[in-house]
Amino acid sequence: MRITIPKSAFNPVFVPYLTDSTHRYLILYGGAGSGKSVFAVQRFLYRLLTLPLCNILVVRAVAATNRDSTYALFRQVIFRWGLSELFSCKDSDLRISCANGNSVIFKGLDDTEKLKSITFPKGELTDIWIEEASEVQEEDFNQLDVRLRGKGTHKQIVLTFNPVSVLHWLKLRFFDRKDPRAVVLKSTYKDNNFLDEDYKATLEGYKETDPYYYS
């Protein structure tokens, strides 16, 4: 499927990771407005359109939060890029299907039984996106990690989250230990070319009072 998406559609800091298929773990973290979640969706849409097999499981700690966050963001980028004719979005059970047979399913870790019965019309699970990964327990991450298996296609987990405590399992696992299968990218609002000046000024105001939003 040949679709042309201009490089200007992406923030430059993320472009080197658009086609990464060598790492198992892609870690995207940063403060508010950094564009990490938008890039995750842009990247997944690119993979859905260009790879012969790409089936994505999008996960949050609570299933109900997907509708107004991850699922809505997928729909927004599909519309913005003019791809509505190539994707079918099923609001009732939060499923997105690409014209080539690839698809996306949205689930939550608050119902692990439903995670056990996930199937895709075309092939196997190839990608997992864990949004707000700091809200997920390490045990739940491990369960997702071991599910992503199989020969023939590269498997990858993308984790997006804001800066975390020095004691959080994400820091211990991906920052304190150096896993050669993981690539880590920190971004800030300064890397996001699509923010308006008023919002940038708002974030600047948190520099001294709340580094969580600023960093």
Predicted regions, residues:
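Phosphate/NTP-binding elements of NTP-utilizing enzymes
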Residues: 1-215
